[in-house]
């Protein structure tokens, strides 16, 4: 089961860049992490954070948190779609929010 992208706050047509948080769950597989990073790299982005854990339950489930910052909204959408298409991925939850100027 996959989840649609959730936008926090009011959508803004003026948002040049966004922050995207992806929470992925899948059965443990040694080749999963490279398959999750590949679509990000192909789109020219570098993750701000990647954290993988199999600490909960019996260890047969891998949860991965992947964060992107400073990416175009379209890039965040494409990454989300690509993550959902990765073989073995059970669920992808995404939160995308406009970046605030400092």
PLM regions with names:
Residues 2-102:
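A conserved regulatory-domain signal marking ACT and ACT-like small-molecule sensing domains
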């Amino acid at each position: 089961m996959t989840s649609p992208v959730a936008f926090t706050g009011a959508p803004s047509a003026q948002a040049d860049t966004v922050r995207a948080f992806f929470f992925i769950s899948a059965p443990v597989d040694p080749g999963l992490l490279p398959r999750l990073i590949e679509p990000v790299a192909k789109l020219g982005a570098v993750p701000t954070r990647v954290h993988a854990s199999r600490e909960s339950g019996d260890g047969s489930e891998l949860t991965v948190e992947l964060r992107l910052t400073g990416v175009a909204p379209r890039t965040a959408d494409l990454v989300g779609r690509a993550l959902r298409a990765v073989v073995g991925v059970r669920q992808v939850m995404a939160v995308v929010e406009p970046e605030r100027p400092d």
